[in-house]
Amino acid sequence: MFGSMQAVYRIESKYIIDSEENYCSTFGSKLHVTARYEKERDNYTFIINRSAVLLNGKPAVKLMDRIMSEVGNSLYPIHLRVSPRLWILDILNFNEIKQRRQQCADDWKAEADSPELERYFRFSEKNSANGKTLIASLYRDTFFNLYFRDIFTPTGNDEARLIRWQNFPERETDQSYLYQVKPEDADRIRLSGEIMKIVPEHNGTFDTVYETGDQGEIRRIKGRIESESEGTRYMKQWTLETETGQIAKQGYKSLILNE
């Protein structure tokens, strides 16, 4: 039976409009992940912490970036209950997180005040109103949207799954993609598909490769989404990989299959 898993990941995501020369921004951080199987519940507990947050390769400097970074960091550590197929079911320390976020917001409100800041805090409070809304907000984050997803169950030839990318191609917009899960070999799984044609003039693709270790543990996730509309091309790229020697031998796939 699965005992535990520990890993340290470094993630970097890059947002590009038309080309890197036109507009490009990057976000990076370290994610510290611990997981254990709970036999009596037949699910898993994940504890996630975050450090070394960088915007365009540097710590946040602008006031709004600093506020968003600190409010984002108040989410951690986060304790998740996760289903056997890797979907997030519950946030076990929700009340603790809500108190941290409120304290962070109160501290900044006492120091700075602006209409933009008020809008941001209203949005943040709405996202953390209850466990369900906070889980939904987690899936707006690249790491959670890719990591907590059933990648070990292949799709059939006529089957497609849905992934939604929020704040893409632009802030306060979202796009959905239908994709298939195809194992390429023993340690590579590809998720690929196309944008849902809700808006006919939008075109786009989703392509991501997961690389796993000997035990099936996730070692690397590398991929991108693209969208094109009215001659403008938007792209988001990401790379998530473990730091050398920082993942347990008992692996992630074993955690899923050893039910």
What are these regions (language model features)?
Residues 88-192:
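Solvent-exposed helix/loop surface patches that form functional interfaces
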Residues 1-83, 146-259:
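Acidic, serine/threonine-rich low-complexity disordered tracts
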